[in-house]
C-alpha cells in the first residue's frame, strides 16, 4: 500500500471515529450507556424517537464550556422516558435536553427524576427544553418526599421546561444547599402548572415549586436567580417559592390563578422585583411574604389575593405583601426579625389586605420589623385594609411615605408623610392588568431616591420625577405578564426550537418594539444590527394577523386597522407582547 493510500485510509478512520464520538444516534439503553461511558468533551448523544422504559442514567463526565457533552432527543418532544426512569449528572458542562418524562410506575421516591449529582456534583450543567408530566408516585407514596429536580453544585441552569401535574410531597426544583458555597444557579423561562396539594392547601410542608436553600445553611449566600417563569393553577402550601438562602433574585415571573406566596422564609439580602401576581381571589393566596434582613421588594404587581383559609378563618401569613414579626433568639428554622427592608413602588389591586406589617404566625414572634421602609406603593380598591399595622415598625430609619390608596381604610394617618387617599382616577384597566392613566395622582408622586429603581415593571425607564406604583406612565416597556398563549412560545417546553439559549437571550435583549403601549398608527421594530427576517403578529387567540419578511434591521408596521388589545410579535425565535390602545 502506498503512503498516499495509507494516509487516505487513516483519514477515513479518523473521520469515522469523530462521527461516532461526536454525533451518534442510540436506540437502546445499552447503546446509550455505552455512548455515555465513551463520551468526551464535545460528544453529542442523540436519543432515537421512541418510548424508553426504566431508563436509569448515571453520568460522570467532564465537558468544557466550548465543548459540552450533550444528550438530546432526535426530535424534541418525541422521546419519552417512562416507568421508573431518572437521570443523575455529575462532572461539568453536561447538557440534557428535549425529553418528556411521563407515565411513571414503580417509582423509587428517594431518587429525584433529575439530580445534578452522580458520584460527584455537576457544575456548569444544564437541563433545558424538557417536560415532566404528572410523574408522581402512588397514593401510598404521596407523603414521601419526592423531588423532581434536585440541584447541587454550582453555576447550573434549568430553563425552557414544563413541570406539570405534581402531586405529593417534594419540591419541583430544589437546591438543598448542604454547604455554604455560593451556587450561582439560574432557573428561567419555565412553566409550572397544575400542582395539587395533599389534602387541603398547606396541610403539609415541602409542596412548593422552587426552594433555594435550607434553614441549616440559610445565613450563607447562594446568588441564585429565578426569572421569567410562569406559575399557573398552582396549589401546594403557603410557599410557592421558598427562599432559604441569601443574595438571591426573583424577577419577571408571573403567578396566575394560584394559592400561596413567594416567601422569603430564611436568608438575607434578596431582591424581588418586576413580578406579576394574579391570585383570582383564590383562598389562601398572597403575594410576597417577608422575613430576614436587607431585602429589596419593588416594582411588583399583586392583584386579587384572598387571605382566608379553606375553613373561613384568616391566615396571618398571606396578604399582598406580608412583613412578619421575628422571634427573640430565633433558631435557624424559626422566624428571624425583619431588618433594613425596603418595600417600594409596588402596585396592589383588589386584594383583601394590601400591605400587612408585623404579623404573627406564632405568639412567640414578638420582634417588630426594624428600619422598615414602605414607600411609593399604590393600593387600589382593597376590601379589608390597604395597610394593616399589627405591630408598628421600630427603628429611626422606619418610615411610611408617599403611599397612595384609592378607597378602603388603612392603619396610617392620611396626609402625613405624603400618604394620600383618592376616591377615583388612580388606575385604569385593560384585559390584562390595571395600569397608570393620564391624570392619576400617582404621576410624578414618588418620594425619595432609590438607586435600584431605574426601570418600571414593564422594563421602561423611570424618570427623575418618578411615578408611584410599579409602572411609569408611557415609559414604553414591553415585559408584559405571561399567559397561556406564551406556553411553548416564550416559556416552557418547546420554546427553544433552533437557536442556542445564549442566542435567544441575546435576541431578547436586542429586539426593541415601540411605542408600547401603542396608541398610534405605526409600530416600530428593531433588532440591533441583525436582519429581522419573518415578523409575525398574532392575537391572543393565536390567530395570525400579520406575517411579513423584512430584509432590514428596522421596520415600521402599519397597525391603524388593528383592534385594541394584546398581541404577540414574533421575530425569529423570540416573542414579545404588545398592547394596542
Which ranges hold each PLM region?
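Bacterial Sec-dependent N-terminal signal peptides
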Residues: 1-25, 501, 568
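Acidic Gly/Asp/Thr-rich repetitive segments characteristic of extracellular carbohydrate-active
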Residues: 22-60, 64, 458, 545
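Right-handed parallel beta-helix/beta-spiral solenoid domain characteristic of secreted/periplasmic
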Residues: 24-27, 49-55, 62-116, 129-140, ...
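Short, T/G/N/S-enriched strand-turn elements that build extracellular solenoid repeat scaffolds
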Residues: 32-38, 53-63, 82-87, 243, ...
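A glycine-anchored, Pro-Gly-centered beta-turn/N-cap motif
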Residues: 50, 92, 154, 563-566
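Glycine- and acidic/polar-rich repeat regions and solenoidal domains
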Residues: 83-88, 102-124, 132-413
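Surface beta-loop-beta hairpin patches that serve as ligand-binding interfaces in beta-rich domains
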Residues: 440-503
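C-terminal outer-membrane/trafficking sorting elements
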Residues: 503-581
Amino acid at each position: 500500500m502506498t503512503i498516499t493510500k495509507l494516509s487516505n485510509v487513516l483519514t477515513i478512520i479518523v473521520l469515522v471515529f469523530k462521527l461516532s464520538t461526536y454525533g451518534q444516534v442510540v436506540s437502546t439503553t445499552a447503546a446509550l450507556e455505552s455512548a455515555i461511558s465513551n463520551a468526551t468533551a464535545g460528544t453529542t448523544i442523540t436519543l432515537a424517537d421512541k418510548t424508553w422504559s426504566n431508563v436509569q442514567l448515571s453520568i460522570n463526565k467532564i465537558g468544557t464550556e466550548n465543548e459540552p457533552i450533550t444528550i438530546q432527543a432526535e426530535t424534541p418532544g418525541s422521546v419519552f422516558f417512562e416507568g421508573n426512569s431518572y437521570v443523575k449528572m455529575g462532572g461539568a458542562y453536561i447538557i440534557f435536553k428535549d425529553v418528556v418524562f411521563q407515565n411513571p410506575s414503580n417509582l423509587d421516591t428517594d431518587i429525584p427524576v433529575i439530580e445534578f449529582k452522580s458520584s460527584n456534583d455537576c457544575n456548569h450543567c444544564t437541563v433545558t427544553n424538557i417536560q415532566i408530566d404528572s410523574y408522581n408516585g402512588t397514593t401510598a407514596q404521596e407523603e414521601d418526599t419526592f423531588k423532581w429536580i434536585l440541584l447541587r453544585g454550582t453555576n447550573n441552569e434549568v430553563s425552557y421546561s414544563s413541570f406539570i401535574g405534581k402531586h405529593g410531597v417534594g419540591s419541583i426544583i430544589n437546591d438543598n444547599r448542604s454547604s455554604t458555597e455560593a451556587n450561582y444557579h439560574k432557573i428561567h423561562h419555565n412553566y409550572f402548572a397544575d400542582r395539587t396539594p395533599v389534602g387541603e392547601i398547606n396541610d403539609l410542608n415541602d409542596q412548593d415549586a422552587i426552594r433555594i436553600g435550607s434553614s441549616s445553611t440559610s445565613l450563607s449566600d447562594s446568588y441564585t436567580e429565578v426569572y421569567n417563569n410562569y406559575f399557573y393553577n398552582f396549589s401546594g402550601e403557603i410557599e410557592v417559592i421558598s427562599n432559604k438562602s441569601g443574595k438571591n433574585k426573583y424577577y419577571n415571573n408571573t403567578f396566575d390563578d394560584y394559592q400561596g406566596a413567594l416567601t422569603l422564609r430564611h436568608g438575607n439580602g434578596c431582591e424581588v422585583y418586576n413580578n406579576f401576581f394574579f391570585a383570582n381571589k383564590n383562598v389562601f393566596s398572597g403575594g410576597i411574604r417577608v422575613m430576614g434582613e436587607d431585602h429589596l421588594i419593588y416594582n411588583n404587581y399583586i392583584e386579587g389575593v384572598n387571605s382566608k383559609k379553606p375553613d373561613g378563618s384568616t391566615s396571618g401569613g398571606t396578604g399582598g405583601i406580608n412583613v412578619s414579626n421575628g422571634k427573640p433568639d430565633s433558631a435557624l428554622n424559626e422566624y428571624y426579625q425583619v431588618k433594613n427592608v425596603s418595600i417600594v413602588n409596588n402596585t396592589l389591586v383588589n386584594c383583601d389586605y394590601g400591605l400587612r406589617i408585623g404579623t404573627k404566625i406564632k405568639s412567640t414572634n414578638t420582634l417588630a420589623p426594624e428600619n422598615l421602609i414602605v414607600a411609593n406603593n399604590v393600593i387600589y380598591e382593597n376590601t379589608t385594609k390597604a395597610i394593616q399595622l399589627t405591630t408598628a415598625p421600630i427603628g429611626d430609619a422606619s418610615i411610611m411615605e408617599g403611599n397612595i390608596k384609592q378607597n378602603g381604610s388603612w392603619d396610617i394617618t392620611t396626609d402625613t408623610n405624603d400618604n394620600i387617599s383618592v376616591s377615583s382616577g388612580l388606575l385604569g384597566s385593560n384585559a390584562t392588568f390595571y395600569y397608570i392613566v393620564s391624570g392619576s395622582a400617582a404621576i410624578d408622586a414618588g418620594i425619595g431616591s432609590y438607586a435600584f429603581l431605574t426601570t418600571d415593571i414593564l422594563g421602561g425607564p423611570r424618570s427623575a420625577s418618578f411615578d408611584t406604583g410599579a409602572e411609569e406612565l408611557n415609559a414604553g416597556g414591553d415585559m408584559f405578564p405571561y399567559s397561556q398563549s406564551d406556553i411553548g412560545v416564550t416559556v416552557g417546553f418547546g420554546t427553544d426550537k433552533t437557536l442556542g439559549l445564549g442566542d435567544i437571550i441575546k435576541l431578547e435583549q436586542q429586539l426593541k418594539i415601540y411605542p408600547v403601549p401603542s396608541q398610534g398608527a405605526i409600530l416600530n421594530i428593531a433588532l440591533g444590527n441583525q436582519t429581522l427576517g419573518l415578523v409575525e403578529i398574532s392575537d391572543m387567540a393565536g390567530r395570525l394577523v400579520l406575517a411579513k419578511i423584512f430584509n432590514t434591521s428596522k421596520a415600521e408596521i402599519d397597525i391603524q386597522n388593528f383592534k385594541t388589545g394584546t398581541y404577540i410579535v414574533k421575530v425569529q425565535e423570540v416573542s414579545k407582547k404588545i398592547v394596542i390602545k
